[in-house]
Amino acid sequence: MQELRFVLIVVGALAIMALLFHGLWTSKKEGKAKFGDKPLSKLDLGESEPKESEMYVAPEDDYEIIRKERKEPAFEDEKPFSTSGVIGDPLIDDLHSGQDKENKFSQPKFDDDITVAEAEAAASIEQDAPAWVEQPQEIDEPLTHHPDEIDAFSGEETIVELDEPISKTVEPELQVIVLNVHCAGDSPFVGTKLFDSMQQNGLVYGEMDIFHRHLDMSGTGKVLFSVANMMHPGTLKHDDPAEFSTKGISFFMTLPCYGEADQNFNLMLKTAQKIADDLGGNVLDDKRNLMTPDRLAGYRRQIVEFKAANA
């Protein structure tokens, strides 16, 4: 049915176009004959218009009616480039009229939809705007400052933590060199004679209730070595020197020490020998054996190896 309808529309359109062309050709031929009969002076605008109206009202001439409809001013102003033949078909007229109605009514509806949509969007933006603005104020303020401060402090702490282990590994292991002065017989050293000999050799009673040999003989400056009691409790504390007695005293120095370790050892050994001579005692090693040249060489070798390991 659709194909048959399309064929009929095409055939009708062709027939109307042929009829229109024939009418135009006939009208043009008749117009030339009429203008040829009249003089030029009688041709004006006032006479031409009544003749067109007379041609329009003549019911016998179909071609004049078609010609009048084509030259209608309202039709030419609206669609000057459209084909006049197609408009004469009723099927095509229905199609065009339906499209025109849809265009006329659809455009206002589209505009109304846009207006309503814009109004709703504007209302939703105004309602949501305060909540959206407040959120960044709560989030951005702590994030812009605190991470930088945390990074700065964390970097400094990391440097301190790295420096501390390095300083600890540089420190050498503490070593102690010990000499002893022991009484020769069963008679112990009496405090009066013992303390007098110690003071004459530059030892000063001080911290931890023992005697110390300082850099200065007056008892000031760094401690080079110290002297303690061989017997329990190890201190040389006394209220009355005459009532104090012990079987021996211990000399000790630490490695590392202030100054030169070998010179401090020689000074400690010399002091121990003088006190032993004053009291009639013997100089012993750290195991409380009599001091021998080999053991003294062992002490000095220990000092040299320590200095080489920590040079």
Swiss-Prot record:
It comes from the Bacteria. Residues 32-54 have a biased composition (Basic and acidic residues). It is a single-pass type I membrane protein. Keywords: Cell cycle, Cell division, Cell inner membrane, Cell membrane, Membrane, Transmembrane, Transmembrane helix. The keyword Metal-binding does not apply. SUPFAM superfamilies: Cell-division protein ZipA, C-terminal domain. It is found in: Cell inner membrane. InterPro entries: Cell_div_ZipA (IPR011919), ZipA_FtsZ-bd_C (IPR007449), ZipA_FtsZ-bd_C_sf (IPR036765). Residues 32-60 are annotated as: Disordered. Residues 1-5 are periplasmic. GO terms for cellular component: cell division site; plasma membrane. The chain crosses the membrane at residues 6-26. Residues 27-311 are cytoplasmic. GO terms for biological process: division septum assembly; FtsZ-dependent cytokinesis. It holds the Pfam family ZipA_C. Belongs to the ZipA family. Interacts with FtsZ via their C-terminal domains. Essential cell division protein that stabilizes the FtsZ protofilaments by cross-linking them and that serves as a cytoplasmic membrane anchor for the Z ring. Also required for the recruitment to the septal ring of downstream cell division proteins. This is Cell division protein ZipA. It comes from Vibrio vulnificus (strain YJ016). The lineage of its organism: Bacteria, Pseudomonadati, Pseudomonadota, Gammaproteobacteria, Vibrionales. The gene is zipA.
